[in-house]
Amino acid sequence: MRPRIIVFLFQVLVVIKGTKLKYYNDELCGRQSTYTSFMLTDAAGNTGNPTHLAPWAVQIRVKARKGDFEVICGGTLITLKHVLTAAHCFQKHFGAKKEGGEENSMSGRYCESNQRFTDSEILTRTVVTVGAMCTRLEQKYGCVNEKQNGKTLKISRFAIGDFYKTHCEQGNDIVILELESTIDDVEGANYACLPFLPEVNIQSGANVTSFGWGSDPGKGFDNAAFPMIQVLTLATETLATCEENWGTSIPFDSFCTAEEEDKNVCSGDSGGGLTFHQSDSAREFIIAIVSYGSDCVQLIGGSEPRSQINTDVRKHQKFIVNFINQA
């Protein structure tokens, strides 16, 4: 994963099939950014302004008992003021039992509707860090300047898909957050293009990019956020292959990517985006939101890879547009 900047000083409206979308410009979205206020020296001794290869990446942080805001998930900026992430990031308990005591076939994904954070908890305990490369200063991993830690903003409102209403089993693992202010003045931040603005098609077998600060067992971060953003290229899979690998039906809004023993999204990467690079425009489009898959520690230990199941953003166009236009 990596970084780049763009400063936006205006609000833009875009017409989508007769609907205006606030805070979005399809000419400026999806472009990488550069930090202009400081310089870094790379491993080869070259000094320059660092670029942010995923300036739409954000950290979802929740206030812990000690008062610190811990990174629990990733997310993706989709306008100057809005973020997409996963609904299960706000789940209090995992592995609930169905009536009768049997766990479901989706790795304990079953839940009750009252197992998520309350609306008040989401608004008062959750913040979003934008324009960041790092979760904290740590020179060993190239996190040496405070500006690499981005800017943290509060959430003014949000909307959750029907994830909890269907016991966390039938898709809709999506949340859209509205930030208290725009990212106009945030160095290193930009938003990804939406896949229906303009419409983009992905060919079967194409690669997508994942980004986040999730755990990395291979580097000793088994249950902790990695200091520096990491970026991975993942191969897409057909829904048929995905269902075969899981041995059961998958959510209606699934978008699947291949798992590998040494290359996969891990705990803490949930809610982050999968983007598709459009070569002719050199821009990144968010296609999906990381939802669930195999445990990285188990994969490293030799477990058979299955498929990573993500939430297809294109299946939630109306949900996204309606929320943004209520701003």
UniProtKB/Swiss-Prot annotation:
This is Trypsin-like protease try-5. The lineage of its organism: Eukaryota, Metazoa, Ecdysozoa, Nematoda, Chromadorea. Glycans are attached at N207. PROSITE patterns: TRYPSIN_DOM (PS50240), TRYPSIN_HIS (PS00134). It is an enzyme of class 3 (hydrolase). It comes from Caenorhabditis elegans. GO terms for molecular function: serine-type endopeptidase activity. Residues 43-327 form the Peptidase S1 domain. Serine protease which, in males, acts as a promoting signal during mating to activate sperm. In the male gonad, probably maintained inactive by swm-1. Disulfide bonds join C73-C89, C242-C256, C266-C296. Its EC number is 3.4.21.-. Specifically expressed in the male gonad including the seminal vesicle, the valve region and the vas deferens. PANTHER family: PTHR24260, TRYPSIN-LIKE PROTEASE TRY-5. Pfam families: Trypsin. The active site is at H88 (charge relay system), D173 (charge relay system), S270 (charge relay system). GO terms for cellular component: extracellular space; secretory vesicle. Its main location: secreted. One of its GO terms (biological process) is proteolysis.
